[in-house]
């Protein structure tokens, strides 16, 4: 993914303020609530029976934080996302995750970021994040044949 210097500035300005646990937990919870079929990948997470249960599930929050930290690392290396090959292979061969869910998750993260950063999250900032997350989703989806 090629980002302009301005797009990188937009992303860094927001990302430097992100609370991984809060934003990651909210994003994964939102994914599981809005796209309930994604819950099948998290059968070991316990109670996912309602929006409230999902939003307060410690495993959802912890995994959301983990995923967001991984995205944070990817944002530092958008020019070379080949390091995500093993993660891609794991999601493809072991977990059988539909690669469209990576795109969905990126979209959900954008929504949560917009909620948290209101005025700062301009259309230009959103466009930069959409572009970057698209590259990350593509890299993680590369392990699919």
UniProtKB/Swiss-Prot annotation:
One example of a Gene Ontology biological process annotation: hydrogen peroxide catabolic process
Pfam family, one: Globin
SUPFAM superfamilies: Globin-like
Domain Globin intervals: 2-145
Keyword presence, Transmembrane: no
Chain positions recorded as heme b binding sites: 63, 91
GO molecular function term, any single one: organic acid binding
Claim: Iron is one of the keywords in the record: yes
Keywords from the UniProt entry: Heme, Iron, Metal-binding, Oxygen transport, Transport
Tissues expressed in: Red blood cells.
GO CC list: blood microparticle; haptoglobin-hemoglobin complex; hemoglobin complex
InterPro entries, A to Z: Globin (IPR000971), Globin-like_sf (IPR009050), Globin/Proto (IPR012292), Hemoglobin_b (IPR002337), Hemoglobin_oxygen_transport (IPR050056)
Cystines in this chain: none
Recorded family membership: Belongs to the globin family.
PANTHER family: HEMOGLOBIN FAMILY MEMBER (PTHR11442), HEMOGLOBIN SUBUNIT BETA-1 (PTHR11442:SF100)
Protein name (record): Hemoglobin subunit beta-2
Source organism per UniProt: Telmatobius peruvianus
Upper lineage: Eukaryota, Metazoa, Chordata, Craniata, Vertebrata
């Amino acid at each position: 993914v090629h980002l302009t210097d301005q797009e990188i500035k937009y992303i860094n300005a927001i990302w430097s303020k992100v609370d991984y646990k809060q934003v990651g937990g909210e994003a994964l919870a939102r994914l599981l609530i809005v796209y309930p079929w994604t819950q099948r990948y998290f059968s070991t997470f316990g109670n996912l029976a309602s929006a409230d249960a999902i939003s307060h599930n410690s495993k959802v929050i912890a995994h959301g934080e983990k995923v967001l930290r991984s995205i944070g690392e990817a944002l530092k290396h958008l020019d070379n996302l080949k390091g995500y090959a093993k993660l891609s292979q794991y999601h493809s061969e072991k977990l059988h995750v539909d690669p469209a869910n990576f795109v969905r998750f990126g979209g959900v993260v954008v929504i949560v970021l917009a909620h948290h950063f209101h005025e700062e999250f301009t259309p230009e900032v959103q466009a930069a994040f959409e572009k970057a997350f698209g590259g990350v989703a593509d890299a993680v989806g590369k392990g699919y044949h």
